Amino acid sequence: GFLSFIRGNFFIPDPKVFWVKPSVSYLQKYLDNHTIDVIISTGPPHSMHLIAEKLHQKNTVKWLADFRDPWSDLYYNKDFNQLAFAKNKNKRLEERILRNSDCILTVSNSLKEELEKTAKKVEVITNGFDDEFSASNNVILDTKFSISYIGLLPKQSNPKLLFKVLKGLCKESEIFKKDLKLNFIGDISEEVKVEILANKLDKNTDFVGYVSHQEAIAYQNKSQVLLLLIPNVKNNKGILTGKLFEYLKAK
């Protein structure tokens, strides 16, 4: 839509670009009075790297740029309908960060291979989980056959085939239909909701919305099945989502 077009062509690399100037000013005052060993920037939002770059240039301090996701090749960028000038500007910013930082950190070997085409040094540190919220030994699983997805679910990850199969199973078995419970905890795209409705699974579905991290962990621990999805896009083999590690924690 129009707002996506504005976002993609005028807010480069992202809407947080307006943080850069005031953040550099604020952090430079801190650096003038404190000694630090290293600056670590993490994105997205990739505007954070622009802040770190300016501080790195002004101070003799090492800089690690952490790429949790790709930059110019991020899967939802195509939704912004970027014009050539915007694409080129975004790419130039990315290449500048990759060349100027002392080291690039990223989450998977596949993404490392892509970044190494430009960056001089790339290291992999995978996602993990916070052990502070470990599963309790006395977790009671749902009595229903619960399938839960926790987190942001964009249209690119819409599990159409899964919904089709579940619809078929509900048709075949009234027992299965009564026992099935789909939980979506977090922000779910409208396209996914439409697909659920089209497959007559709406009565089996609970859209919980946003909850605290602790509540999300509780849903995760009591669910019979945890649903892990990655975007159905080009180069998705490099996507090693942090959700995988959160799910692995649920015993």
Where are these regions (language model features)?
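Carbohydrate-associated surface elements
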Residues: 107-110, 125-128
